[in-house]
């Protein structure tokens, strides 16, 4: 209750609702599949391993692992995401761009690219980039007091402009292992409405704390299972 209550009195999110959206009968947003993300594919899980961790639970193996600036020496049997300026075209590895590096997107060849994108980024630039690059999957991020509202606004902006790029939702937290239940409740509160509205092609949960990777990955899969349309 306190977590949701903190959104009260937040700054206005100046978004527009796509005219074809129906809150009473939501359908999954139409997207063009990029490899196994979007389209008719089930939503994916991206896991964070910037701390160098390599071992995942056999029960909750992520589809993709974001490793930041360097690939681990020992890799798991899944795909990897690495910062675009460190990308060397390694097998089963794909580049991720921050929104302020849009000019670099065309310079790198890859069948799948990720773009970290907040609502409020210069829309003319990123909309043109997404239209030109259907291989991009958007990773929606937000630091807004009501980040659920801001992430929903970003996806509606994509729909209003006829874009079919898939969207993965990035959520960040700061919890210790002892606060596992708080993490689970907050992640479910942030992700549930976006999942039920059919706006999400994947989940990326990040925690700056002592929570185990297995607990974070299990939470992501639990949210997907509970909210499946």
Where are the language model's segments positioned?
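Catalytic alpha/beta core domains of metabolic enzymes, predominantly
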Residues: 1-18, 22-26, 102, 109-229
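Active-site beta->alpha loop and helix N-cap motifs at the rims of alpha/beta catalytic domains
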Residues: 6, 11-12, 20-149
């Amino acid at each position: 209750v306190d977590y949701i209550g903190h959104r009260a009195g937040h700054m206005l999110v100046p978004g527009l609702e796509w005219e074809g959206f129906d809150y009473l009968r939501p359908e999954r947003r139409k997207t063009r599949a990029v490899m196994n993300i979007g389209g008719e594919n089930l939503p994916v899980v991206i896991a964070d391993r910037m701390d160098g961790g390599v071992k995942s639970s056999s029960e909750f193996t992520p589809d993709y692992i974001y490793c930041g600036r360097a690939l681990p020496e020992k890799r798991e049997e899944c795909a990897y995401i690495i910062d675009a300026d460190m990308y060397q075209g390694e097998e089963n590895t794909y580049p991720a761009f921050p929104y302020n590096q849009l000019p670099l997107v065309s310079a790198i060849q890859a069948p799948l690219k990720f773009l970290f994108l907040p609502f409020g980024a210069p829309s003319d630039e990123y909309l043109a980039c997404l239209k030109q690059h259907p291989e991009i999957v958007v990773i929606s991020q937000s630091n807004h007091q009501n980040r659920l509202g801001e992430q929903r606004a970003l996806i509606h902006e994509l729909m209003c402009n006829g874009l079919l790029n898939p969207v993965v939702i990035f959520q960040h937290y700061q919890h210790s292992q002892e606060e596992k239940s708080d993490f689970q409740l907050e992640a479910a509160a942030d992700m549930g409405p976006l999942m039920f509205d059919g706006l999400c092609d994947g989940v990326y949960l990040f925690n700056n704390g002592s929570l185990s990777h297995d607990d974070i990955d299990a939470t992501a899969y639990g949210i997907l299972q509970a909210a499946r349309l």
